[in-house]
Amino acid sequence: MPIGPARMPLMDHLGELRRRLTIVVVSVLAATVFMYFAAPTLVDILKDPINGSLQPGEQLSVMTSLGGFSIKFNIAIKVALAMCTPMIIWQILAFFLPALRPNERRWVVPTVLVATMLFFAGVVFCYMFIAPAAFDWLLGETRSIGVAMPKLEDFINTELLLMIGFGVSFELPLIVFYLAVFHIVPYASFRAAWRYVYVVMLVVSASITPDASPVTLIFMYAVMLSLYEVSLMITRFVVVARDGKAGLTESRLGLFGDDEDDDE
């Protein structure tokens, strides 16, 4: 859909916001209905990470009469939101596009593509590596004190939240990149404040891991640290190539000092 660069009055902005919110809501609702009927297949896919951890005689159980509907609806709404992520990101960026400078608008489409790829990379990484290790550890802890009777609803909910958490955490490089490249937060500030950043990432990792197990916490923290350092390396290369070393300390908003030295 076309996006005009012209400035609009307040009421036109509100009308544009309502139109884009309507597109998002209708799209998510339609995707939810479709995913609800595809839920049995999705359940089989989501059960794979735990199947290898189940011992003979153990099986995932549904304890209530409403459990089947609850599981299918839970899967449908969360998968629909994940599948609509590219469209949601596009609608957000398209709404703010008229406020951007011409040389900044060319970043919009690449941003949508990269953000989408990073999100789904995080989801796939969690599904293939994190979820199997986490549930293997959790079931082992359960068996050490009693008989394991894993509930399908709890497992599915935890797995979906884990995958969404890792998908969001994989957006970290994009956030750091744009903050530094557009000189909102200088690269030098990111590098100088690494101790505080590491502590914040540890707190965030503990907050967004729904199972509270040390396995997922350690994996999440390691992933966020790795992504942060890689994003800083890429950002430094781009900023120096475009603006020279002076760009490493430049701040457009003036919120951070320009006298910080690049310690690399």
Where on the chain are the PLM-derived regions?
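Membrane topogenic/interface segments and analogous intrinsically disordered interaction regions
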Residues: 1-264
